[in-house]
Each structure stands twice: as structure tokens, then as C-alpha cells.
């Protein structure tokens, strides 16, 4: 760096001497042109010039790279309905619906077999030898005959299905005082005593019997009922039996 500055000062000194020589020569006489001096040091760069006029539009560049995925736009309007698809498989069976309204009354049926429908009769034994409470239904649980199944051995009650005149009878073995009621009605609250049969004896076997004819309506119930005198037996050799049968059906029913 010092060498470069030394050369610069040398050149400046020579230029100065040349200038003085020329000035002196001109002042004395005009001589021939001197030798061109050494080029000066480059000056400081000038300020930027004014913007030039816009250039001609260049050709279209290559497509840029794909940008990032943008956010979802707003929901569009419904499209045009498509064509119907194929019929799908059959679904499972749905729940059972509510019962519909009753249909119209059907036509009158053919006449039935009078003989078959009017045969009503039953006989049943009591084989249970257990004490009875007052007002308890006396159950004759072993069926001998039960035409048309109007007698129910599980509760000892006869239910009328064919209105008409019926005959009911019982034969009861006992050892002591015995009174039984024969009752009728449609339900527990409407049961009424029709007749009471009694027999009195002490420490001896006896058989008590009784019977009655009743006009029954459909769904009326008939059964025997115990009282406070209830020495009824139901053992082998001392049976008790309850019987009933239809005498004449009610033709107007």
C-alpha cells in the first residue's frame, strides 16, 4: 500500500514540474508539445441516473410449483338429484304394530251339532283329607266324568257354558257334624248361598247327601262351600263326591 502511494506522489511531482516547465517555456517562447502525462486516478462513482423506459414484455414463464392446500370453502348449493340406485337387501322384521280396529261382523255361521254342544255333565271325587276353613271352596280334585269340560278340578268350581236347567248333588262322608253350602254367582263378590245341608253325628261314620235344580245363565258359577262344621272326609272307603249335569238347555239363549 505504501509503495502505491509513493508512486502516486511521484507522478504528481512530475506533473507539477512539467506544468512549471511549460509555464516557464510559454513565458519565454513557444516550444513543441510535451509528452502526454500519466492517466490520473479514477474518480469517485457518480450518483444513480434517471430510471430508463420500461422494457418490452418478456415471454410467459414456466408454471410455478403447487401451493399449499387452502381452507375449505362454503357449502355449495345442492346438486341435481342423481339417478335412483339399485334396490337394497331386505331389512330385518320390524316390531309388532298395535292391534288394528275390529273388522265388520261376519255372516251367521252354519247350524252346529245340537247334541254335541248340549252334553254337559261332571262327577268328581275329593281325595284330600285336610281340614277345611269356614267359607272355603270344597275342592273335588279327582275327575270321574267331565263332558264339555265345564267343571274345573283345580278350584272345585262349575262354570255354566250352556244356559238351562241343571241338577247338582253331593254325597259326603264324615265322622262328626257336617254342614255344607251350595252357592252360585258370577264372581267372588256376587256369590250367594242357595241351600245348606246339615247332618249331626258324634264319633261315627255317616253319609250326607243333598241335591237341587238350578236355572243357570251363561258364565254363572256353582260350587260347594265349607262351614264351621266341616268334618268332611276324603279317604279310601269313605269317599265324598260332587255331581252336576244339564237337564234342559235354554232354547231362547
Swiss-Prot record:
Q: Its principal location?
A: secreted
Residue ranges of domain C1q in the record:
115-253
Q: Residue ranges under compositional bias (Low complexity)?
A: 78-96
Q: What does this protein do?
A: Core component of the complement C1 complex, a multiprotein complex that initiates the classical pathway of the complement system, a cascade of proteins that leads to phagocytosis and breakdown of pathogens and signaling that strengthens the adaptive immune system.
Q: Give the start-end ranges of region Disordered.
A: 35-115
UniProt domain Collagen-like: residue ranges: 29-112
Its PTM note reads: Hydroxylated on lysine and proline residues. Hydroxylated lysine residues can be glycosylated. Mouse C1Q contains up to 64.0 hydroxylysine-galactosylglucose residues. Total percentage hydroxylysine residues glycosylated is 95.1%. Contains no hydroxylysine-monosaccharides.
Question: Which protein are we looking at?
Answer: Complement C1q subcomponent subunit B
Question: Which UniProt keywords are listed?
Answer: Calcium, Collagen, Complement pathway, Disulfide bond, Glycoprotein, Hydroxylation, Immunity, Innate immunity, Metal-binding, Pyrrolidone carboxylic acid, Repeat, Secreted, Signal
User: What's written under domain?
Assistant: The C1q domain is the ligand-recognition domain, which specifically recognizes and binds the Fc regions of IgG or IgM immunoglobulins.
Instruction: Show the taxonomic lineage.
Output: Eukaryota, Metazoa, Chordata, Craniata, Vertebrata
Assembly mode: Core component of the complement C1 complex, a calcium-dependent complex composed of 1 molecule of the C1Q subcomplex, 2 molecules of C1R and 2 molecules of C1S. The C1Q subcomplex is composed 18 subunits: 3 chains of C1QA, C1QB, and C1QC trimerize to form 6 collagen-like triple helices connected to six globular ligand-recognition modules (C1q domain).
For this protein, the record's PANTHER family field holds: COMPLEMENT C1Q SUBCOMPONENT SUBUNIT B, EMILIN ELASTIN MICROFIBRIL INTERFACE-LOCATED PROTEIN ELASTIN MICROFIBRIL INTERFACER
Task: Provide the leader sequence positions.
Answer: 1-25
Post-translational modification Pyrrolidone carboxylic acid, affected residues: 26
Q: In which tissues is it expressed?
A: Highest expression in thioglycolate-activated peritoneal macrophages. Also found in spleen, thymus and heart. Very weak expression liver, kidney, lung and intestine.
The scientific name of the source species is Mus musculus
Detail the disulphide connectivity of this chain as listed in its UniProt entry: 179-198
Q: Where does Ca(2+) bind?
A: 199-200, 206
Amino acid at each position: 500500500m505504501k509503495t502505491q502511494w509513493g508512486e502516486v506522489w511521484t507522478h504528481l511531482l512530475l506533473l507539477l514540474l512539467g506544468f512549471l516547465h511549460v509555464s516557464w517555456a510559454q513565458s519565454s517562447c513557444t516550444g513543441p508539445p510535451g509528452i502526454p502525462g500519466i492517466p490520473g486516478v479514477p474518480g469517485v462513482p457518480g450518483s444513480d441516473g434517471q430510471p430508463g423506459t420500461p422494457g418490452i414484455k418478456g415471454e410467459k414463464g414456466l408454471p410455478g410449483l403447487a401451493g399449499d392446500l387452502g381452507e375449505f370453502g362454503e357449502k355449495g348449493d345442492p346438486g341435481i338429484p342423481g339417478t335412483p340406485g339399485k334396490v337394497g337387501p331386505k331389512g330385518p322384521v320390524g316390531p309388532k304394530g298395535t292391534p288394528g280396529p275390529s273388522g265388520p261382523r261376519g255372516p251367521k255361521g252354519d247350524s252346529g251339532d245340537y247334541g254335541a254342544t248340549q252334553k254337559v255333565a261332571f262327577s268328581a271325587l275329593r281325595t284330600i283329607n285336610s281340614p277345611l276353613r269356614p267359607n272355603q271352596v270344597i275342592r273335588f280334585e279327582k275327575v270321574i266324568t267331565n263332558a264339555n269340560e265345564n267343571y274345573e278340578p283345580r278350584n272345585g268350581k262349575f262354570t255354566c257354558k250352556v244356559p238351562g236347567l241343571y241338577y247338582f248333588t253331593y254325597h259326603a262322608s264324615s265322622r262328626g257334624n257336617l254342614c255344607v253350602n251350595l252357592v252360585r254367582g258370577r264372581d267372588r263378590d256376587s256369590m250367594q248361598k242357595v241351600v245348606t245341608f246339615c247332618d249331626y253325628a258324634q264319633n261315627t261314620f255317616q253319609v250326607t247327601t243333598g241335591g237341587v235344580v238350578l236355572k243357570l245363565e251363561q258364565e254363572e258359577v256353582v260350587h260347594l262351600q265349607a262351614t264351621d262344621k266341616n268334618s268332611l272326609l276324603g279317604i279310601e272307603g269313605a269317599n265324598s263326591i260332587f255331581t252336576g249335569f244339564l237337564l234342559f238347555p235354554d232354547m231362547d239363549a
